[in-house]
Regions:
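Short amphipathic alpha-helical interaction segments
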Residues: 373-389, 402
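Short acidic, hydrophobic short linear motifs in intrinsically disordered regions
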Residues: 359-371
Length: 415
């Protein structure tokens, strides 16, 4: 006996409001559901196609669709003869030059194997040993010393001092890229994600990490990097390594509606019956205003609210699209309870005081010192709580201006 499917009430197989990144290797979240961003997509592809190597950056607020855009660009490049893999390379906040170089080498190695499973030869052997050693050691600096001989098959694993990867890695990376180009690849495209993880504590250190491997690893012919993050446009040091970032603006409301329609169609349960939208258009319009471009937050709000409301519906009932009043009431109660539980009394009261001024307002720490009548360290601590709870986000700094903070759609729904 099949289990109940709430979304079947609308002739849908599952929730159309998933927040997972679209991927080329996923049937559940395929790239064919991608909508909009044609100008940005073409700009990124043109830069790749016009250069022997490239370093591009995509910036924008959290949840706006940066990662999915780059996944789509990778698929486009793959179709044009470039090699890539479906993996997204994370950048660690506590990484070092060696670790970042190792991640790049691993990404190129994975791309080679994904596109040429029978790859062999000294270049591949050398990369394989280095990558395996890095992964077995959890990214540590125990690497292989490569023996001399035909095919490079003679090797001995030895523990090397810190910095060994910086000595061997660039050569192995260069040779592996040449191998790929010699096998017909027009280049290799890698996706580095979440530059904010590298930059949030110290922008100059982030730039030092990137500059530290730029000449050794980032400039090789055939290597095309696209780095994604929320902060790349605000740090000139990082921009000295990558091109001027492509800053994404929110999808227009019409594109969001198109995105939802594509998902409804893709998830149609019974082809003999039409699907029905689970939510009325005014609901999407209202949430679009509240979340101000945060598509991930908008989709999560729709999924949370509609799932809760559908749970009260009898199986087999003729269900109309969820209306605005019902959804807002459900989300207000849900978000309010969750935030109060996470924040505690003091931080919650300060969030309410901010909302009473204007929930859509941007505030600096100096303004919040005056609003909350507390000292700056207390404001900083409260903001950290609010950010961790998903109630507030810090906007990218503009030059030397003070950082501005904004209440998220999740918090605005609760207040």
């Amino acid at each position: 006996m099949p289990l109940p499917n709430l979304w079947g009430l609308y002739n849908l197989r599952s929730s159309p409001f998933f927040q997972a990144t679209l991927r080329a290797d996923s049937d559940a979240t395929p790239l064919r559901l991608f909508v909009g961003r044609q100008r940005e997509r073409q700009l990124l592809l043109t830069t790749i196609g016009s250069s022997a190597s490239s370093r591009q950056a995509v910036a924008g607020r959290p949840g706006i669709g940066k990662t999915t855009l780059v996944q789509t660009v990778k698929a486009d490049a793959q179709a044009a003869g470039y090699w890539s893999s479906n993996e997204i390379i994370p950048i660690s906040a506590d990484g070092a030059n060696e670790q970042l170089l190792g991640q790049l080498l691993s990404g190129v190695y994975d791309a080679v194997l994904a596109n040429c499973p029978t790859a062999a030869g000294p270049e591949v052997e050398a990369a394989q040993q280095l990558v395996r050693s890095l992964r077995l050691r959890g990214g540590g600096l125990t690497v292989s010393a490569f023996g001399v001989g035909i095919g490079g098959s003679q090797s001995e694993s030895v523990a090397t001092p810190p910095g060994a990867l910086l000595l061997d890695g660039p050569r192995v990376l260069r040779d592996l890229l040449r191998y790929a180009l010699g096998r017909g690849a027009r280049g290799i495209v890698l996706h580095l994600n979440n530059l904010e993880n590298l930059s949030e504590a110290d922008a100059s250190r982030a730039a030092d990490l990137l500059r530290g491997i730029r000449d050794q690893a980032l400039l090789h012919d055939g290597l095309h990097l696209i780095v994604v993050g929320t902060v790349v446009q605000s740090h000139t040091q990082i921009r000295s390594v990558f091109s001027d970032p492509l800053v994404l603006e929110p999808l227009e409301l019409a594109a969001v509606m198109q995105l939802l329609a594509h998902r409804y169609e893709a998830l149609q349960l019974d082809p003999a019956r039409p699907w029905r939208p689970p939510v009325a258009e005014p609901v999407v319009q209202k949430l679009y205003e509240l979340f101000r471009g945060d598509l991930r937050g908008l989709l999560k709000a729709l999924e949370d609210g509609i799932t809760a409301l559908l749970g009260l519906t009898s199986a087999g009932a003729d269900v109309a699209p969820v209306g605005l009043d019902d959804l807002l009431l459900t989300l207000r109660q849900r978000n309010q309870a969750e935030l109060q539980d996470q924040l505690g009394e003091s931080a919650w009261e300060r969030l309410v005081a901010w909302a009473q001024v204007d929930p859509a307002s941007m505030q600096t720490q100096a303004q919040l010192v005056a609003l909350w009548a507390v000292k700056q360290p207390s404001v900083s601590q409260t903001l950290q709580q609010l950010i961790e709870a998903g109630a507030v986000e810090a906007l990218p700094r503009r030059g030397r201006e003070a950082i501005r903070y904004l209440m998220t759609g999740t918090a605005r729904l609760a207040l």
